[in-house]
Amino acid sequence: DTTKDMVSMERPETGKSYFYIFNFLPYRHEFSNWTVTGVDAQYEPDNWAKAVNSTNFRKAFLYAINPAVTLAVTAPEGYENYKLHTITPPSFCANSKGVDYTECGGLANLSDFFDEAKAKEYRDAAVEELTAAGVTFPIKIQYPYNPAVVDWDKQCQVFKQQVEAVLNDGFDFISIIITQGPSDNFLNAVRRVGAYQLMSYYWGADYSDPETEVYPFYQEAGDRGTCYSFLRTGVEDGIVTGETADLVMQYMSMVENAKTITEDLDARYEAFADAEAFLIENALVIPLGMPVPPYIATRLNLWEGQYAPTGLSTNRLKGVHILDHYVSMEEYNANRDAR
């Protein structure tokens, strides 16, 4: 009991969200300022390229993934509070009427996606479509993690078990292959060089405008962008074709249109919200949740510190008092409510 009273949580990171990304560029590509090496041959990148080009395949994942299972690894109690069905977290910004951005435009129509029956419907449609395209099953899916991040390996394990239980029920559809990346320089060694097929990652807003939330997905023509999914590059290289190519380019156009709206903020927010909803509804990205604050032992009242929904203000310790005792969860909650 004494030890329990010495443990509380870090202050939540409200401007960050986690989501699942597909790699639409599984092959080597030379940008002017960066080289993507792509997926290793043992993970069958040709097979993957055909699969990820199928909206039915991606939507099977959209409805098969239960975010609660992954979040429960780090938040065994209260994980429902961290689930998201959008990429932008709530309370990020609001329009002139006080409507939260996540309730604007097309985002207002989104809710939790997890639905096993729907997932299997899309899987069955994908099997028929991909069999005709020459895809072999099970589809290998490299799913990497950073061993330096606490519990990421456990999250990968429960993710694999949960998703395969849904999508492999009655048919050997996928094989999620968990791989350990390096603990140092993980971004450059894995995500930025496209050495994955599916992975969970995050984005933190830089400023309080929805344009900041498009950076992991939007790319200008010929540009490497922020090296997340390589959506536009996949189209430019002819890997992403047909319906999916049309969806990708429509998203790019929606973002470009939203960026031009600078005088009517309500219209701007609605346009960006429509683009984000379009991205999610077509399973070009799959929401997961907000970061779960870790449990810590501290003598700081973290709620006295500076706060901003974006940027690094919450990392500053100016004005925070050092107490003569460790903060319990009861005191932590009282400090939060008193701010």
Residue ranges and their predicted role:
Residues 1-36, 73-74:
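Extracellular/periplasmic solute-recognition and catalytic clefts
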Residues 3-7, 53-59, 66-68, 137-140, ...:
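Loop/turn elements at helix/coil->beta-strand transitions in domains of secreted/extracellular proteins
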Residues 6-10, 46-48, 59-60, 108-111, ...:
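Generic recognition of flexible, low-complexity loop/linker segments
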Residues 9-15, 166-183, 230, 316-321:
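A generic structural motif
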Residues 12-15, 60-104, 151, 155-161, ...:
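Detector for C-terminal structural segments
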Residues 24-71:
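Extended ligand-binding regions for polar small-molecule ligands
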Residues 35-48, 100-110, 224-227, 231-232:
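A solvent-exposed, charged loop/short amphipathic helix patch at secondary-structure junctions
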Residues 78, 111-117, 121-205, 244-248, ...:
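Ligand/substrate-recognition segments at binding pockets and active sites
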